[in-house]
Amino acid sequence: MDSMSKSERVAFAMAELEARYPAPPIPLDHRDAYTLLVSVLLSAQCTDKRVNTVTPGLFELADNPRDMARQDVDEIRAIIRPCGLSPRKSAAILKLSQMLCDEHNEQVPCDFEALEALPGVGHKTASVVMSQAFDVPSFPVDTHIHRLMWRWGLSSGKNVEQTERDAKRLFPESRWNKLHLQIIYYARELSPARGWRIEEDVITLKIGRKAVIADARKIASRRA
């Protein structure tokens, strides 16, 4: 990290991300707010790639709350088993589908409080749905964003709640929905948790914590 101010570092990161990912696609395949909600729920401790291989079979069985609420939980569990945590996730999918039918006219609510009241839906899942399904300014923080905000010296890294507060404070609200996707793609490509090639990570090299860069170079030299 050089003598740049925090606002200059934020501006550099945003410009670099915009240049690399001008139109970042939503990683999870979906058709509407309901299929996105289910896909995000399945993505807990699972890769988006694997979720995208599982959801076609699940949505062939049922792709709306009414039809899903009529399914047997064991059948849902069998289909989603490759995503992991299938007992918990299948129960949540069935229960939230029933709740959408009973309390929300079979519609996914565009409301944080109502979303977080659904079984299996936490703040991050609700934020993804609000951002990607309803285009409501949100900043979902996953492990990738949490890691990069720390590496870039833009958050203390204490917890994801603090990282979200810092991201919302530092980045303009008009950019939140796009930025969180841009950071995820950058993290996966150039600043992963494992197999990190620091010399290719142009943003961290420019604005990152000096100690983080030094440690990464030491690890890279041992691998060489």
What are these regions (language model features)?
Residues 2-223:
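Catalytic cores of DNA base-excision repair glycosylases
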